[in-house]
Amino acid sequence: MAGNFWSVVNGVISEADILLEIIDARAVAQTRNLEIEDKVKKSGKTLIYVLNKCDLADKGDLDKIKKALSPSVAISCKDHHGMNLLRERIIIEAKRKGFEKPKVGVLGYPNMGK
């Protein structure tokens, strides 16, 4: 199972131009995958931290997290909060990298809102 997981992760990283890591805004340290982040950084591709479930997170903590993780966008899949900001961030990063129609890959632990 672990081999299959990394095979999928490596495939997503290989195919995508921009990658989104979906993280639970209430438990960032527990839901980030530093190995995945390292693989993305080594690939030279853009990683956007997507802080899902922001409607359930402490606002003060969320502001600190957004400053520490860059680029990041706070969203709530439940009520669609932040989706336009996420689209805008993807467009900004795509233009910065010269992609007209970027392939976007989504990574993260299960139950994070992918």
Question: In which residue ranges do the predicted regions lie?
Answer:
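ATP-binding Walker
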Residues: 112
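Active-site flanking residues adjacent to catalytic metal/cofactor-binding acidic residues
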Residues: 23, 51-52
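N-terminal accessory targeting/assembly segments
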Residues: 1-43
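Canonical P-loop GTPase G-domain recognition
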Residues: 45-48, 54-109
